[in-house]
Curated annotation (Swiss-Prot):
Taxonomic path: Eukaryota, Metazoa, Cnidaria, Cubozoa, Chirodropida
Organism superkingdom: Eukaryota
Free-text function comment from the UniProt entry: May cause profound effects on the cardiovascular system of anesthetized rats (at 25 ug/kg), since the fraction containing this toxin and CfTX-1 produces an initial increase in mean arterial pressure, followed by cardiovascular collapse in all animals within 1 minute of injection. To note, the same fraction does not induce significant change in heart rate. Has weak hemolytic activity. Is lethal to crayfish. Causes cutaneous inflammation in humans. May act as a pore-forming toxin, disrupting normal transmembrane ion concentration gradients in susceptible cells.
Localization, UniProt: Secreted; Nematocyst; Target cell membrane
Note in the entry: Negative results: the fraction containing this toxin and CfTX-1 does not cross-react with CfTX-A and CfTX-B antibodies.
Identification of the protein by name: Toxin CfTX-2
Post-translational modification: Contains disulfide bonds.
Record text on subunit structure and interactions: Oligomer.
Any Gene Ontology biological process: monoatomic ion transport
Keywords annotated in UniProt: Cardiotoxin, Disulfide bond, Ion transport, Membrane, Nematocyst, Secreted, Signal, Target cell membrane, Target membrane, Toxin, Transmembrane, Transport
Amino acid sequence: MILVSLLPLLFMTGIASESTISSGLASLKAKIDIKKPTGKQLFDKVKSMEQALENKFSDDDERAKVMGAIGSLGTAIGKFQSGDPASIASGCLDILVGISSVLKDFAKFSPVFSILSLVVGLFSGTKAEESVSSVVTKAIQEQSDQELQEALYGVKREFAVSKAFLDGVRNEESDLRPTEVSALAANIPVYQGVRFIAMVVQRIKYIKPKTESEIKRMLTMLELFTDLCSIRDLILLDLHQLIATPGHSPNIASGIKEVTSLGREEYQRVFEDLLKTDDEETFLFLSYLYPKEKNEQSRKIFKFFDLIEVKYDDRFKLDLSGGQALSTLQWPNYYLCPHNDYLANNCHDLRVGLKLEKLSDGFYTIKTYGRDPRTCYWTDDYVKISSTSNGELEKFSFVPVQVKGQKAYLLSTKKWPHNFAYSQKTANGLLSILKDVPSKLGYGNQGFFTISTYSNPKNRHA
């Protein structure tokens, strides 16, 4: 507690000597009970951290801020040694509060981030390892994303000023004089925002989304990128149109045009990797991005993909509405049809067809044909069929993928994009639900569906 009470003074003076850090670590070591199973291990790790800190931080201000992170450890150490899950969770919160309070000041200085790695390393091998690691990692990630959002605001403000300047120039009826062309170049640098755009591209490139939270973060990054590039392209287009006027500066105009397309090939490669339909690691991500119409975020992202000519599977653009024959890659000679109150993959011929209807948000309803048409809906365990409405549970998504060169679809829903249907290996072949891509869970091709149009389904009855 003494250590924590000293922090305001340290921050006001901006000075923390090496002996202060050593003193803080000594206080931390004093709180460790080496008689407990984890105590000796923690004690050794604190000693290792002490040496690392002495080698790593030379700036007084940085040392002061490092003390903030150490202080948060000092308050939490007893809770982690208790072995009680509730206390461990409370300790995680203590560390999160301690780190987030100082991150506001020093997150931009990469040398100081190493203390956070040391904090995580301190607890490795203990019961609290996963909890602490995830809390600290989340704190770093959220702070980093927040910084990016703040930086975006600054770049957008720069773009807004540039756009206002160009609008003012365009509103003048007289031609631009050579000196005014120079003024344009000075006020609207063609490289504006390039570095920031490159930062976002690198984030997108290396996020490698596998979990729901990572995928949502990726989608936010993509939306961020489309906002930024759209504004920048608009400004460069305005600038090009003004300078390309006959009698002005054709060479400069040509240069601006080249700058407009600069980097698009690199961006295309990054996004085309994200949209691969033959890579199982991307399938879950596609289920969150697709269909294109699902929400404003997806619409904006796909609109931008089309603008910069990103190549992706043509089936993203298809409308599957109408009478369709649905089968699986595992059993291509059997088709999906009603089995009592369930949808099953057990019809050898198409006695009862299925009708897909595309909705305004890009999702589909699946309905039966026959004298008593019913609608399919998603439950926790199966795809069921009912004559009554089941709201959002009726909205299905067909995610286009490729499996060893064969085109197929994953069957998911709007409500649970991370859940997928597969055909059971039983006599009735009921469609069951899994919380991941079925092939990744050992179900082979049972969860990959093929779709083909068949003629005159309305004349087919049970």
